[in-house]
Amino acid sequence: MARSKTSHNWLKEHFDDKYVKMAQKDGYRSRASYKLLEIQEKDKLIRPGMTVIDLGAAPGGWSQVTSRLIGGQGRLIASDILEMDSIPDVTFIQGDFTEDAILEQILEAVGNTQVDLVISDMAPNMSGLSAVDMPRAMFLCELALDLAGRVLRPGGDFLIKVFQGEGFDVYHKDIRKLFDKVQMRKPSSSRDRSREQYLLARGFRGIDGAASIERF
C-alpha cells in the first residue's frame, strides 16, 4: 500500500510539474531541456558550428537543445546506455559508458576533430543509499572528465551533473587544475529536493601529460 501511495504521489508531482507541461508544449523530450536552456541563457555555452559530445543523452532533451543551437554546421555526438529516438544530424552511440568499447566508439566518432564542449547529464540508478550512490556517481563524473581531457580543444568547456557528497571536493579541485574558470549552477528547473548541481568548467588548459583515469 505504501509503495502504491508513493508511486501515486510521484506521478502526481510529475504531471503537475510546470516544466513537464512546458516540455510537452514545446516539443522537448524531457524537462531536463530547461536545465540546459537556463544555463545557456546565463553562460552562452553553446554556439553555432560547435562540435559537442552529450553523455547520458537519453531521452534526448539536451541533444534537442544542443542540435538546434549548433545548427547545420555543428556536430553532435550523443551517447547513453538507454535507447534514444533519432534526432536529425546527431550521431548516437548506445552502450555502457563505463565499458572501454563504448569509449572507443565515441573516440572513433570524434576522429581527429577537436571538441569544443563536453556535456554530461549522466547519473547512476539511485538506490537511496548515499554510501552506494555517491561512489557510482563520482565514478561516472571521473570518466566524463577523462573523456573531456582526451578530446577537448585548448579553451574548450565542460558541463557536468554532480552530486554533493563524498568525493566531490577532490573532484572539484581536480577540475580547477584543468580549467581557467569553474562555477556551480543550480537551474530553477532542477527540483529543490534534488542534490544535483551542474559544474561548469571553462577554458580547458590541457592535461599536460597527467595520467588518465583507469577504466575497469
Swiss-Prot record:
Residues the record marks as active site: K161
Gene3D superfamilies: Vaccinia Virus protein VP39 (3.40.50.150)
A GO MF term: rRNA (uridine-2'-O-)-methyltransferase activity
Primary site of residence: cytoplasm
InterPro entries named among the record's database cross-references: RNA_methyltr_RlmE, RNA_MeTrfase_FtsJ_dom, rRNA-MeTfrase_E, SAM-dependent_MTases_sf
UniProt binding sites for S-adenosyl-L-methionine: G60, W62, D80, D96, D121
UniProt keyword terms in alphabetical order: Cytoplasm, Methyltransferase, rRNA processing, S-adenosyl-L-methionine, Transferase
Catalytic reactions on record: uridine(2552) in 23S rRNA + S-adenosyl-L-methionine = 2'-O-methyluridine(2552) in 23S rRNA + S-adenosyl-L-homocysteine + H(+)
Cysteine pairings via disulfide bonds: none
Localization per record: Cytoplasm
The enzyme's E.C. designation: 2.1.1.166
Keyword Membrane in annotation: no
GO cellular component, one term: cytoplasm
The keyword S-adenosyl-L-methionine belongs to this UniProt entry's keyword annotation: yes
PANTHER family: RIBOSOMAL RNA METHYLTRANSFERASE, RRNA METHYLTRANSFERASE 2, MITOCHONDRIAL
Family label: Belongs to the class I-like SAM-binding methyltransferase superfamily. RNA methyltransferase RlmE family.
Function: Specifically methylates the uridine in position 2552 of 23S rRNA at the 2'-O position of the ribose in the fully assembled 50S ribosomal subunit.
Protein name: Ribosomal RNA large subunit methyltransferase E
Lineage: Bacteria, Pseudomonadati, Pseudomonadota, Gammaproteobacteria, Pseudomonadales
Gene that this sequence comes from: rlmE
